[in-house]
Amino acid sequence: MHEDLLSPKLQLLQTGFPERLVKLPQNAQVAWREAGDASSDFAVVLLHGISSGAASWLDVALQLGDKARVLAWDAPGYGVSTPLAPAAPADADYAQALAQSLLVLGVRRCLLVGHSLGALMAARLAVTVAPGLVEQLVFISPAGGYGAAAKAEQQAKVREGRLAALAEKGVAGLAAVIDQRLVSSEAPEAVRAWVRWNTARMQPQGYAQAVELLCGSDLAQAQGRLGMPVQVWVGEHDVVTPPAACKAWSELLGAHYGTLAAAGHASPVEQPVEVAHRLASLLNQSYLPNTS
């Protein structure tokens, strides 16, 4: 049954949001998926969360591809992307790989979207690594990280718990139940199957590195340092990064706050049409290339 649900999705993935590999220094590569005009120097750039991958943005990309160039990466250590060199990489390491990739892809300006853990990478790019690239920033259900000194005890528990679960269950075991926390109770089985498929493609090493990123980063460091318009959106049924927490982040960062109806944490998978509609509205605010 799950194969029947996934087959049309996988076909769409190949035809509508194909993968391309970007070569980086030290024989590294980063896998990207792309829709829209590949010659544009402006793109909507989509960063996935800790238990996901580039393909999770498929339906959002299909909605946006006729309006803008759309790019989504498998972060280092995910899919066929090379893991980062440090065993415990920082958000700056991911942001550097992101900036290098976008340079190779010819992107000079972007609307940057970070979902969950992707928000920490996006924030680092926008604050210090390449702020000139980012015209607008969207955090969807942002992970705040556990890098603040006051969160040291919580950091240790999160690291131990996530790495123990990986060791005990493996990627397949994590994927088998991941949808139970990432989508709302009303999510159809096709959505759940797609969430599980994306998680099942994780590399153990890449996931372990991402746990270190989560534990070592602090989204609050971006306070007062984001020189572009910022949005924070969250699914109304999100139990991972609940609406109250996301609203607090929006207030701290001076961002516009909005909720996504009938969605849990994985709102780009559960409600892709609404997510794409909101992103398209931002594109209409003069963020597209000048064609005159």
Kindly label every feature range from the protein language model.
Residues 227-263, 269:
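Conserved loop-alpha-helix segment in the C-terminal half of the alpha/beta-hydrolase fold
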Residues 123-128, 132-167:
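Flexible "cap/lid" loop of the alpha/beta hydrolase fold
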Residues 254-292:
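Catalytic active-site module of serine/aspartate enzymes centered on a nucleophile-bearing elbow/loop
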Residues 93-110:
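Conserved acidic catalytic loop of the alpha/beta-hydrolase fold
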Residues 114, 118-122:
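Gly/Ala-rich beta-loop-alpha elbow adjacent to hydrolase catalytic centers
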Residues 150-156, 167-224:
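Conserved alpha/beta-hydrolase catalytic His-Asp/Glu region
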Residues 1-44, 65-68, 107-108, 280-292:
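Alpha/beta-hydrolase fold catalytic core
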Residues 28-83:
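Conserved HGGG/HGGXW glycine-rich cap/lid loop of the alpha/beta-hydrolase fold
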